[in-house]
Amino acid sequence: MEIELLSKARPSGLRAPGRARSKSSINNKRSYATLQGITGNKSATRRLCSIVALALAVAACRGETGNADSASADMVQLAAGKKSKTIRPAPAPDPAPAPAPAVDTSSSSLEGAAPIASNFDPAIELAATSIPPSAAPDVVGAFRFICLPGQIKSDDPIVYPGQPGRSHLHQFFGNDTADANSTYASLRGAGNSSCMSPVNRSAYWIPAILNGKGSVVRPDYVTIYYKRRPLSDPIVSDPAHPQYQGKGIKLPNGLKFIFGRDMLNLSQPQTGAISFSCDGPTAVPQSSYKNFEEAQAGCAVGNRIGARISAPDCWDGKNLDSPDHRSHVAYGGYGGWGYYKCPTTHPYVIPAFTMGVWFTQAQGEVYSFVSDSMDTSAGHKRGDTFHADFFMAWDPAVHDMWEKNCIDKMLNCSAGDLGNGKQIKQTWPHSWTASPRLVAIPS
């Protein structure tokens, strides 16, 4: 698996030389692959080894080409140059908003909700860096960053808006004010972010991970990897192209959805190309498992278990939400026509992301998602109910940067690199190991 020795130290905000480039492979089965490698300077490596040992992470890629590129490069760069960043307090939060309606009204624009500027200067959250390399021979632009675990709440602003404590327990990432009352306006108006910086006030959440001993396991980190073909690519711009996928557009403001196992309708097939992996000093290379039970059986104590899931890449162009919180987005497919494309009901191609949730396996623990207890179907396994929620609330200017540069110029951007000589600063307190690792299940 992806175990990379930290290479060269660098000044704060600058990228380490030798950044891994993405590699391409065609996979019509949409399977995961992780192809990477970083060769570091040996003397610099020895110096860094006294501070950190190994940085590891996997960001598996799901898409029309089966492209793969790990977010381990993010951690190499952050560990080499983000240690001494000044941590600034979040802007003062706005008053608690009124409960949101269950479903948003339709969007009148392909850009989604009207953009809401940050209540701080986003320029102070950016650092100078070099321009990243092209992602070629890959066919998608890549934008990656690392998130750290945030709040743990029995809230779900998508399924149970305005109803605190109504949902099963969730582990949140991103905006640290996200709760049952969150709306696009409230997320944009307040909060720090465990996804590097408050320029990304989006909220991401998954069912909490339990250890079988009455505690919640907090992830060490989460990798996020956005990707899409550039808008100049005729496959997403020219309807006359023989392999036209759909019209490429930016990620709509305020878009929210759920993907993975449908907890409101467990009879539905699982979505999100879910897989589990093992990474660490004794991990089996390129391991892949179907659930926690298989992963624990094949992953020795002391290694990290990773749960990976990919978001939809097609949108209906009208709705920022839907009654089931899923129908307004969709996954492309190959069908009988032999090439990847979006359904005619969802003709717009949006930047999709793959999320990898990584935590350290300890002796005597038995892992499950809190939602697994809701699945009473015959033969169900621990981990079968993996799903994730997303509520888009990026700073409009910074969002525009990574879309126009990393995605549309088909660059290989890691560690919050925006592809324009700027990089998002790591202002959230950073560590590669969750501390505390375990917390009590809230009463």
What is the role of each PLM region?
Residues R88-A100:
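Intrinsically disordered, low-complexity proline-rich regions
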Residues V58-A60:
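C-terminal motif of bacterial Sec signal peptides marking the signal peptidase cleavage site
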Residues R62-T65:
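Bacterial signal peptide processing site
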Residues K29-C49:
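Bacterial N-terminal signal peptides that target proteins for export
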Residues G18-S24, T45:
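Intrinsically disordered, low-complexity segments enriched in serine/threonine/proline/glycine
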Residues K8-P17:
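Intrinsic, low-complexity polybasic segments
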Residues A79-P91:
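Polycationic, low-complexity disordered segments in secreted or periplasmic proteins
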Residues V103-R166, Q171-I309, D316-S443:
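Primary mode marks residue(s) on the alpha4-beta5-alpha5 output face of response regulator receiver
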